[in-house]
Amino acid sequence: MNNARPIRRALLSVSDKTGILEFAKSLHAQGVELLSTGGTARLLADNGVPVIEVSDHTGHPEIMDGRVKTLHPKVHGGILARRGIDELVMEQNNIKPIDLVAVNLYPFAETVAKEGCTLADAVENIDIGGPTMVRSTAKNHKDTTIIVNASDYDRVIVEMNANEGSTTLETRFDLAIAAFEHTAAYDGMIANYFGTQVPAHSKDECHHDSKFPRTYNTQLVKKQDLRYGENSHQTAAFYVDSPSFNGQGDEASVASAIQLQGKALSYNNIADTDSALECVKEFSEPACVIVKHANPCGVAIGSDLLDAYNRAFKTDPTSAFGGIIAFNGELDAATASAIVERQFVEVIIAPKVSQAARDIVAAKANLRLLECGEWNTKTTSLDYKRVNGGLLLQDRDQGMVGLDDVKVVSKRQPTAAEMKDLMFCWKVAKFVKSNAIVYAKDSMTIGVGAGQMSRVYSAKVAGIKAADEGLEVQDSVMASDAFFPFRDGIDAAAAAGISCIIQPGGSIRDEEIIAAADEHGMAMVFTGMRHFRH
């Protein structure tokens, strides 16, 4: 084949030595001459693989404690030489072609993540020769093969076996893309780290100043193309965090979930599933969250998942049609059967799905069934919000109050049952679009008022939703994601039958708001924490 390039000489120099010995043995078996450096060379030699030290190949020793090893014309000339063009120059300078380079870089991300890492530690783990070889080889992909991921070793060996020791241009180009992605991520990590440091009193040291660097670099990997975006006239794709760059690859999420069956996820499916899953993750007892247009329309805790689903559905059966359902436990056969017999649903997501449940859901071939895995801790990460010409970055809202954090500000103390419902209601309100009002009773939402421009209207909407579904508001509790600016919201809640309110507090009219609650005989609890969601 015209674009095939034989591999006769390879340079191997890796920090992560996973699979490198087996790869080197396979190359040697095909007659490939091996060059290497430092620890990689020692590993090969100790295991009987013939290897030439790069310093012997170049005729120049490693210097400056290994800082300069591969930065030499005999290395980069051998990599960058254009086959069929540069042979005379190579002969005049005694440069031998290097056909394959396998390199991965110093572990910068792991180093700076360690507690007590100093700037000096970070600097010594900035790879120079490695990225230079990677970029050189990727640039000359027409003639040379670059490998930066151990997962590609077998792929290259298989192709060489099938092509008389050669690689194809298609493979070399694909590997070159991976190489440039690799070096882009690496430099981005370094820029992010340095961008959060400020000089300290010592000229050789810095200290951490901010989690927000001067320039923000990240890397996302395309998971799938989507049929269209939020609307049919918009094109779209779904990108996920690169685990090597962002270190979040193992978090249970819609991004890491495995689709077990159903049609391809749409743009809106993904956004709504994220909202549902993140909400249900707040609960430790068996819980179900039903979401429509990014807002919870039904949330409940139950004795088991079936009970939780039945109660969540009861909140708003109308809105639940075509919704997204999330659970915080293994989806079982009884719950799956209840769902498919009762309603049309776009997506079901759970940490685990039993085989019996899978068999039942299979009757609805288009229903998207996702398994996201268990979650144990909350991962620290950032939220992004795109604005025209810029990007807003903030910590993810992982704040949540407990019983010991809230303050009763009314004359009447909430009962134990009311306080339990307040905690439940507050968790739900965190995931409702502002202005958010949630009515709840017995660990089940009664009405949800979302996205109204005034808080009092959100309260009215919650009441209307409850009335439309025949749910009794009397003696329910209410959560508000932000403070009440006026007493009208309290008056509306009292008129609807609300007995107790949880809200952040912090209004200049707090005294007036508390007085209104006392006037109506309501209990009121302040959290001191707001949960705006836009």
From Swiss-Prot:
Residues 1-148 form the MGS-like domain. It catalyses: (6R)-10-formyltetrahydrofolate + 5-amino-1-(5-phospho-beta-D-ribosyl)imidazole-4-carboxamide = 5-formamido-1-(5-phospho-D-ribosyl)imidazole-4-carboxamide + (6S)-5,6,7,8-tetrahydrofolate; IMP + H2O = 5-formamido-1-(5-phospho-D-ribosyl)imidazole-4-carboxamide. Pathway: Purine metabolism; IMP biosynthesis via de novo pathway; 5-formamido-1-(5-phospho-D-ribosyl)imidazole-4-carboxamide from 5-amino-1-(5-phospho-D-ribosyl)imidazole-4-carboxamide (10-formyl THF route): step 1/1; Purine metabolism; IMP biosynthesis via de novo pathway; IMP from 5-formamido-1-(5-phospho-D-ribosyl)imidazole-4-carboxamide: step 1/1. GO terms for molecular function: IMP cyclohydrolase activity; phosphoribosylaminoimidazolecarboxamide formyltransferase activity. Keywords: Hydrolase, Multifunctional enzyme, Purine biosynthesis, Transferase. PROSITE patterns: MGS. GO terms for biological process: 'de novo' IMP biosynthetic process. Its EC number is 2.1.2.3, 3.5.4.10. CDD domains: IMPCH. One of its GO terms (cellular component) is cytosol. Disulfide bonds: none annotated. Belongs to the PurH family. The IMP cyclohydrolase activity resides in the N-terminal region. This is Bifunctional purine biosynthesis protein PurH.
